[in-house]
């Protein structure tokens, strides 16, 4: 398994050298907000919404004091806008009042924030702090890792645990970002382009194993 994992990591690194989060942001708390908006929504849609949102509320204080109903108007097109708007305002208020205005750097602290689950927390830890072992289990990651035989099942917490056991900690965050890029560019759920997939030699769908 160790050799297989190393080969998959190398193939993804060669294909996607820039393992960057697709969400656009300038400040750490803006990434937290963008990730919350991305739930059940495309990153592309979020990136259309956030410029106006961040311009209207240019500081953490502005978000913390924002009228939730007004925020709803800005994020409406991202879906589940009432919950998302409320979470954003409450989370920013908690950052200001309890965390010194900074996105905290531990899983325990992050999970206290409204609207922040393990997926979001792992992404923030990996992208903001470069924390080793940060495994972001989104739908692309779960689906492709099942095809590659690196994980089994669809439960994000269980897949996260399985991947953490086999991925080198320093590679885990970039690995997950690259799987998202690969899922969008090549390994689409409905119509995967197996003929141009750099992971085909390791994939159950392609090899039939």
Predicted regions and their residues:
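Catalytic cores of DNA base-excision repair glycosylases
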Residues: 2-209
